[in-house]
Amino acid sequence: MKYVTRPSFLSLAVLLASSGAFAIPVPTGTKEFTLNIDTNLQLRLEETWGGPPPSATANAAPSGHLNTDIFLRRASFSARGTAYEIFWYYIKLETGRFGARGNYTTASQLQDVVLGYIPFEDFYIEGGFLKTPLSRPAVDSSWRSNSLDGVSDILLYPNTRAQRQNGLQVRGLLFDKRFLIRGGIYEGARAGNGGATFTQPYVNPNGWPMLGGMARLNLVGYETSYTYPGIHVDGKSYVSAGVGAHYQSHSGSAVQADGTLSDYVALAADFYADLALPGDQEAVLILDGYRFDYGAGAPKTGYGTHGEAGFRWGWIEPQLNYYWFNSDTKTNSFLRLAGGLNIYIKRHHAKIQMEYQNTIMNGTLPNQPDHTMTPYLHQFLVQWQLTF
């Protein structure tokens, strides 16, 4: 019987944590430390027209005509490796939307910081600035996306940045890789932070962490990376279904009869299928649904859903996607209907994505009684990506 040694599966863990990137190994002169670096560059052309009245940072041009914008959607630099043959680490610096609407003051930020220990193969104990699990799309890979924009617009987490927050979690495959669990405790909402004021009724008055996580059943294949692709483009098939939840005491936004704030609760269920077909073809289907509850009448209380479908013939893939959140207030809702074309030059490492979008953001959706619909914002986007 051949045993997997700790150093060997630690090295494998670092490779998988890279989410398929062409990581560049950097010699360190010792086996106690390993270092791999990679980068992701996304240049976007964005044509915008229609929608609500123009502003300095969004919508059509000030004249009301078509606005043309060229900017870096993402420019990131990552480092990952192992330490002392028992730990692994991952750190990512990213600048988002650099130069959009002529703004070159965008700060680079810590996007991910993960410190991990691997007690046995395919099981991780992690802490740091973590992607918060709720559904599979909630922990997706931004550079291996199927659609141009991710699910963040309808993930109404408390006090996060790009779905990330400080926390401690476990992440692993169990029972012959049939089940995946991912969850733990996270910082969540805090009085005086994340938009909350330090006044009564206090947000999270007891200072308790948020509980969150998801569980998945792997029907075909399995995934071990830290983030998950929208479409794999690797010649393998993956099918899974999952459920997820969040809870934090007195961290909602509706005041209850006893003068305290309501609890924050989120529920999710999702299905993912990526089928590799003969002749270098691939079909992908993503469906997920959400319930966010910040208390009765709160703007972030409501139901949401997201879906994507695509079919790849060799290097070309047409795709459709939608994002929908219907706030209980009926005036803080979100809707995006979109479709486009992906051109894979070197899988996800070099690709071009084109997409047409119709979006209602923080507004009123169609067919809402006693409410006037917010006009659609129209956009045509082209994005060039290089990852190595």
Which residues fall in each region the model found?
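Outer-membrane beta-barrel "beta-signal"
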Residues: 210-219, 374-388
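Predominantly the C-terminal beta-signal and adjacent terminal strand-loop region
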Residues: 348-382
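Acidic/Ser/Thr-rich, low-complexity mid-to-C-terminal regulatory regions of eukaryotic proteins
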Residues: 184-186, 196-200
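Flexible, solvent-exposed loop segments that connect beta-strands
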Residues: 52-64, 196-198, 253-260, 297, ...
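Outer membrane beta-barrel
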Residues: 24-191, 205-223, 301-337, 357, ...
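Bacterial N-terminal signal peptides that target proteins for export
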Residues: 1-10
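N-terminal signal peptide c-region/cleavage motif recognized by signal peptidases
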Residues: 18-20
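Detector for outer-membrane/organellar transmembrane beta-barrel domains
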Residues: 30, 206-208, 216-328, 335-338, ...
